[in-house]
Amino acid sequence: MFAISKLSPLLLSLVLLTPIVRAQSLSEAQVKSLLVRVAERRASSPDVHADFQEQKTMHLLNRPIVSSGKIWFHAPNKFRREITGNSPSVTVSNGRDLWIYYPNFKSAEHYFLGKRSPVDAAIAAINTALNLENVENTFRISGAKIDNGYDLQLLPRSASMKRTFQKFDLRLNNDLVAERTEMAQPNGDHIVTTYSNQTRAAIPASTFEFAPPRGTEVTNPLGR
């Protein structure tokens, strides 16, 4: 069994979430109805593109790390996440492989998905925030209706998910797209991500493929 500590800190920071605001609580039936609406919206518009800003408070650091960039997502499990600024990175998954590329260091990490490793648990959490497909199988869900959308609190069912994060809160806007997410990890790390300029325009399939540039040092942290 792979240890979660072997994963890249950037990979672990990808899971996205939000705190619950006191509002009109949803019944179990209302939560199920909301998830049906999300599924219908996803079926008609499987693509999401947004800008994001993220703040990570890590137990080993005195100051939070703030980053921003863009994210592209195609349901059910393809995404691309580009962080800009002084420490840029590109994270791409086509549903089978995951790449994390660091252009400043000309290095890339390559992970193979579907091996029931901690990587799969982390990616499942990312997909949950942006997709919510089959979310009831993985999480116990409660929530509330707020003026501009919904706040959901997701508690992981599986041991692998519980090792990845302790708290997973998700805010959806009225278009049923992630607006803010918050995650607390068992090690004390805390990540808050906010999204803006969300669109559902079609995204080219090539967006979710990655080939490391010539001269890139490629590593496989978890092997094959």
What function would you assign to each model-found segment?
Residues 58-60, 79-80, 87-89, 100, ...:
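Short beta-strands and strand-coil junctions in structured, solvent-facing domains, enriched
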Residues 45-47, 66-68, 74-76, 86, ...:
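Extracytoplasmic
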Residues 70-122, 191:
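An acidic-aromatic
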Residues 125-130, 138:
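Anionic-ligand binding region
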Residues 25, 109, 134-223:
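Gly/Pro-enriched, hydrophobic low-complexity segments
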